[in-house]
Amino acid sequence: MTRRIWLAAACLTLLVLPIGAQARQYRARLSPVPIDVAMQATIAGSGSVTATLAGNTLTLSGTYKDLRTAATVVRLHRGPRVAMRGPAVADLKATGGTMGTIAGTIELTKEQLDDLSNGRLYVQLHSEKAPDGNLWGWLFPQEGKKQ
């Protein structure tokens, strides 16, 4: 009897693990967001970032192009609400130049997981002439995209 219970528990575990282990996909469209009129002359470009959440590990990768000056810094930020700016929570890597790639892997806290699922995390790319941010993009779930 005990052997059957252990066997049933093992089978149930094998069935449940793949469901919980599915990765969720997120996407951000990077675009310029001028803070004031003076910034309109210094910011330009576009890009996109795809993020995969597996457990509490968020892996980001993306591209950007057509910046007016070279990229300097790219970070993951947390806004207090959707589409509101907030503090940086992690550094990402950019290849530099006026076009390139973005990459990073971050272990998210419970609070950051909640922020991600509620659209409060965003990617911000800075450039030489736009040190306060050149491109922004909020991470939103890709509907139906689980791995």
Tell what function each PLM region has.
Residues 8-16:
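Bacterial N-terminal signal peptides
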Residues 1-9:
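Bacterial N-terminal signal peptides that target proteins for export
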Residues 18-74, 78-147:
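Metal-centered catalytic cores of metalloenzymes
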